[in-house]
Design a protein with these regions (language model features):
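TRNA-recognition modules of translation machinery and tRNA-sensing kinases, especially anticodon-binding
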Residues: 125-421
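N-terminal alpha-helical targeting/anchoring segments
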Residues: 1-129, 144, 148
Length: 421
């Protein structure tokens, strides 16, 4: 949600943002609703003052033993008028809020303008793309040859794009999680294992719900959704709270399974474990002072890069364009890892600064002194690891000529010093 004052006083900034994002949004209706809403606030405040004044008059009359019947009639009329206005005000407030919750976030000036991923900007590359002197396989063939994944039985049990991890791939998956949590613990993150379901109010605080409903699973007959990422649960964790300024930044590392419909996956992604309905993920989430959020954004990206460098996985960093980034983010970096079996870089990380957009929706504020005015803080999020995608990268990039998989050195201690699968 954007600052209503900004929408009212500088609507051209909002129009420019909508144009850059190529989003069709009825800003004029929102502005009109805001104006009507403000007029109702003035009218209801005036009537409440009038009602209070009449109540005092009645009290004075009764104290003096005088007849207050005419004033009581006046009070009744005022109360009826106020009740009617409050109903109308609630209606316009609901209309305004519903619209305001769907407007996208502002866009940072460094974000490239463009319709889609073709306008994304490559920021850097790291690592050498592996060169093989033998015919390589993709992760689907590798996992089948080594009995590491069972897709056929998973499809029988749960449907397409589910999987059974098996044998040493289970251990490698757990090694990635354990290493990732240890890695972030050393970077001043507090570890969080959130609820795997959230209610609609929490979801609407973190995302534009109508957009995200197509992605996540709804629990039938319950006000609950399976989480698509722990980001949403961590964002809502501090909803309606005032945080002490001295405690900022708050850095959380959330570990959880994630559940997504992943509609629209095509080609080879329909097979294997790269794009699936369920996966384990470690997510970074930060509550920051507004003046520090861009520094925190770069810090988060640097930490995530360091993690993949330690895994020896070649990657590139992309700055997403206005047409490719999410509506909640003001600026997003993606990290794409090299997948040797596909001869391509594929997305593994999304790292975003959401400014005060989520904090306004979730009513999360901070202050430095007890009697000081509160401010909305900034929220940031970044994937550290979605394990199935990194399992794909490791299987393809670390395959050997005798059909095995070399285990990255930093993970070997987590697998009893095992060096290959």
């Amino acid at each position: 949600m954007l600052d209503p004052k900004l929408i009212k006083e500088k609507p051209q900034i909002i129009r420019d943002m909508l144009k850059a994002r190529k989003v069709d949004f009825d800003l004029d209706t929102l502005i009109e609703c805001d104006q009507i809403r403000r007029e109702f606030i003035i009218k209801t405040d005036e009537l409440r003052k009038k009602k209070n004044h009449v109540a005092l008059e009645i009290s004075e009359k009764k104290k003096k033993g005088e007849d207050a019947s005419s004033i009581l009639s006046k009070m009744k009329n005022t109360s009826v008028e106020l009740a009617k206005l409050e109903v109308e005000q609630e209606d316009i407030e609901n209309t305004y809020t519903k619209l305001a919750l769907t407007i996208p976030n502002l866009v940072h000036e460094s974000v490239p303008i463009g319709a889609d991923e073709d306008a994304n900007k490559e920021i850097k590359k790291w690592g050498s793309i592996p060169v093989f002197d033998f015919k390589i396989n993709d992760h689907i063939d590798i996992s089948e040859n080594l009995d590491l994944v069972d897709l056929e039985r998973a499809a029988k049990v749960a449907g397409a794009r589910f999987y059974y991890l098996k044998n040493d791939l289970v251990r490698l998956n757990q090694a990635l999680i354990s290493y990732g949590l240890d890695f972030l613990s050393k970077k001043e993150y507090s570890l969080i294992q959130p609820p795997y379901m959230i209610n609609r109010e929490s979801m609407e605080g973190a995302v534009i719900a109508d957009d995200f409903e197509e992605v996540i699973y709804k629990i039938e007959d319950e006000d609950l959704y399976m989480i698509g990422t722990s980001e949403h649960a961590m964002a809502a964790m501090r909803s309606k709270e005032i945080i002490e300024g001295k405690d900022l930044p708050l850095r959380y590392a959330g570990v959880s399974p994630c559940f997504r419909k992943e509609a629209g996956a095509h080609g080879r992604d329909q097979k294997g474990i790269f794009r699936v309905h369920q996966f384990d993920k470690i997510e970074q989430f930060v509550f920051s002072r507004p003046e520090d959020s861009w520094k925190e954004h770069e810090r988060m990206l640097a930490i995530t890069e360091e993690f993949y460098q330690s895994l020896e996985i070649p990657y590139r960093v992309m700055l997403l364009s206005t047409g490719d980034m999410g509506k909640v983010s003001a600026k997003t970096y993606d990290i794409e890892a090299w997948m040797a079996g596909q001869s391509a870089y594929r997305e593994i990380v999304s790292c975003s600064n959401c400014l005060d957009y989520q904090a306004r929706r979730l009513k999360i504020r901070f202050r430095d002194k007890t009697n000081e005015d509160t401010q909305y803080l900034h929220t940031l999020n970044s994937t550290l690891i979605a394990t199935t995608r990194i399992l794909v990268s490791i299987m393809e990039n670390f395959q050997t000529n005798d059909g095995h998989i070399r285990i990255p050195s930093v993970l070997q201690n987590y697998m009893g010093n095992q060096k290959e699968i």
